[in-house]
Amino acid sequence: MAGNLLNGLRAAIAFLTTLPVRIVDGDYDAFADRQYLFIPVAIVTGLLLGVAGTLFQCILPAPFAAVLTVACIFLLTGINHLDGLSDFGDGLIASGPREKKVRAMKDVHAGAGGLLFMAMDLLFLFALAMTFAGSPTWLFVPLLVAEGCAKVAQITIIAFGKSAHEGMGSYMIARMKKEHYLAAVIGAWIAIGIAIIGAAIIPGGGNPLRVIMAGGLAMLSPLAVALIILIISDRNFGGVNGDVIGAANEIARIAALGVMGAVLWMRF
C-alpha cells in the first residue's frame, strides 16, 4: 500500500511539476488510482512559489517581482497546462460544427484562439502578481491559495466530466473515485483555510475580516470555474479531454488570484 502511494506521488510530481523524478512502470496507474495526490503536490508547489514570490516582493520593485513570479510559476509547473489552454482556445474560437472544433483543439499548431488565450493568461497573471506585489499583502498566501484552487478545478473536471474522446483525460476520468475527489477537496480547503487564517492574524496583513472573506470566496472559485468549463466543453466538444483539464488549471489560478485581489482592494 505504502509502495503504491509512493509510486503515485512520484507520478503526480512528474505530471504536475518540472521537478526531476524517476518514473517506473506502474507509477501513473498508481497516480490515476489516487487522484487526491493532486492536492499535496499543489500545496508544496504553492509553498515554493509563495516563498519565491515573497522574496522577490521584498527586494525588487513590483513590476520586476511580478515578472519573476510569473516566470517561476511556469518554471516550476511547466507549460503542459498552458498548452492545454491554448488548444482549448483554438477549439472554442473555431467556427462550425462540433467535429471541426474538436479537430481545431487537437491540431498541434497554435491558432489565433490559442495565442489569444495564452497571451491573456500571461497578462492576467502579471497584472494580478503586480497587484499583490505592490500592496501590503504578501504574495505568499495568494500564490499558495491559487495553486490549491487550480488543482481543485482540475479534479472537479475529472470527477464530473464525461470523456470527449480517448486519451489522457479519459484515462483519468475513468479511474477517478468520488471518495478520493471529496477527500482532495476537503484536504485542499483545510490547507487553504489554515493559510488564510494565518494571513489574517499576522500583524500588517490588512483587515482580518477582509482577508478571510477574500480567501473564502477564492476557495469557492474553482468550483464555479469548473462548472462553467464543463458546460462550455459539453456544448462545444461533447465532453472534456486533457486539454480542457489543463485549461481549467490556468483559468482557476487566475480566478482565485482575481477574487482575492478584488476583495482586498475594495474600498469599503
Swiss-Prot record:
<dbReference type="GO" id="GO:0051073">
    <property type="term" value="F:adenosylcobinamide-GDP ribazoletransferase activity"/>
</dbReference>
<feature type="transmembrane region" description="Helical">
    <location>
        <begin position="244"/>
        <end position="264"/>
    </location>
</feature>
<feature type="transmembrane region" description="Helical">
    <location>
        <begin position="1"/>
        <end position="21"/>
    </location>
</feature>
<protein>
    <recommendedName>
        <fullName>Adenosylcobinamide-GDP ribazoletransferase</fullName>
        <ecNumber>2.7.8.26</ecNumber>
    </recommendedName>
</protein>
<keyword id="KW-0169">Cobalamin biosynthesis</keyword>
<dbReference type="Pfam" id="PF02654">
    <property type="entry name" value="CobS"/>
</dbReference>
<comment type="pathway">
    <text>Cofactor biosynthesis; adenosylcobalamin biosynthesis; adenosylcobalamin from cob(II)yrinate a,c-diamide: step 7/7.</text>
</comment>
<feature type="transmembrane region" description="Helical">
    <location>
        <begin position="112"/>
        <end position="132"/>
    </location>
</feature>
<comment type="similarity">
    <text>Belongs to the CobS family.</text>
</comment>
<dbReference type="GO" id="GO:0009236">
    <property type="term" value="P:cobalamin biosynthetic process"/>
</dbReference>
<keyword id="KW-0472">Membrane</keyword>
<keyword id="KW-0808">Transferase</keyword>
<dbReference type="GO" id="GO:0008818">
    <property type="term" value="F:cobalamin 5'-phosphate synthase activity"/>
</dbReference>
<keyword id="KW-0460">Magnesium</keyword>
<keyword id="KW-0812">Transmembrane</keyword>
<feature type="transmembrane region" description="Helical">
    <location>
        <begin position="182"/>
        <end position="202"/>
    </location>
</feature>
<comment type="function">
    <text>Joins adenosylcobinamide-GDP and alpha-ribazole to generate adenosylcobalamin (Ado-cobalamin). Also synthesizes adenosylcobalamin 5'-phosphate from adenosylcobinamide-GDP and alpha-ribazole 5'-phosphate.</text>
</comment>
<dbReference type="GO" id="GO:0005886">
    <property type="term" value="C:plasma membrane"/>
</dbReference>
<feature type="transmembrane region" description="Helical">
    <location>
        <begin position="59"/>
        <end position="79"/>
    </location>
</feature>
<keyword id="KW-1133">Transmembrane helix</keyword>
<feature type="transmembrane region" description="Helical">
    <location>
        <begin position="138"/>
        <end position="158"/>
    </location>
</feature>
<feature type="transmembrane region" description="Helical">
    <location>
        <begin position="36"/>
        <end position="56"/>
    </location>
</feature>
<dbReference type="InterPro" id="IPR003805">
    <property type="entry name" value="CobS"/>
</dbReference>
<feature type="transmembrane region" description="Helical">
    <location>
        <begin position="212"/>
        <end position="232"/>
    </location>
</feature>
<keyword id="KW-1003">Cell membrane</keyword>
